[in-house]
Amino acid sequence: MEISLLTDVGQKRTNNQDYVNHYVNRAGRTMIILADGMGGHRAGNIASEMAVTDLGVAWVDTQIDTVNEVREWFAHYLEIENQKIHQLGQDEAYRGMGTTLEVLAIIDNQAIYAHIGDSRIGLIRGEEYHQLTSDHSLVNELLKAGQLTPEEAEAHPQKNIITQSIGQKDEIQPDFGTVILESGDYLLLDSDGLTNMISGSEIRDIVTSDIPLADKTETLVRFANNAGGLDNITVALVSMNEEDAE
């Protein structure tokens, strides 16, 4: 397994409210965490870094070695972090703080993930890009209800309004999923600064190109910037080899 992480402020923003990192626990199991923060001043920066770092530090201290244990851990620790960031957000300086969250652990040939917000996790297998997560957003709710066409959703003025975030008052309802991995698969975690700028087919073409993994993440970010770079752009790309998929 090989991992490449990259974050970029983009072309229009003055600060980067995204955060990404990866961690290994005492059983040697890898977790990748990506967050896209929101809130005035530095609240978004703090929320995203805090969520990633708190969860990462907690993961490093575990001996978790099974998919079922990971799912229980996700359910427990994501709500703890939600309440922690919500409490901090009561301070006037951090009013409105919150963050999306993508958390993915790899146990042998399985990936298990938790999803909150409108960042995304995708699987690139062969010549196909599969979006594994469904955005927790107002526009996606309208789309699923048949009140918007995909074209209308793409250009909707309220596209950035999310229906769930880490830091909300109510208990979060994360989406969980697992994927059986095959040799040659790629997993991509990204903030919406990537997927709002480039298509799934462009992502697939870059990820399956014959260049080193770090060059693939750089190319993804460069394409998003060339398309306008309207937001911070963050990617975590994981390449699975034969030993991982056995």
Curated annotation (Swiss-Prot):
Domain PPM-type phosphatase span(s) in chain numbering: 2-240
Cellular location(s): Cytoplasm
Pfam families linked: PP2C_2
Regulation: Phosphatase activity is inhibited by NaF but not by okadaic acid.
Up-regulation conditions: The phpP and stkP genes form an operon.
Function: Protein phosphatase able to dephosphorylate StkP-P and a phosphothreonine residue in a phosphopeptide synthetic substrate. PhpP and its cognate protein kinase StkP appear to constitute a functional signaling couple in vivo, PhpP's primary role probably being to control phosphorylation levels of StkP and of its targets (which include LocZ, DivIVA and KhpB (also called EloR/Jag)). PhpP thus performs an essential control of StkP activity. Overexpression confers an stkP deletion-like phenotype.
Protein name: Protein phosphatase PhpP
Organism: Streptococcus pneumoniae
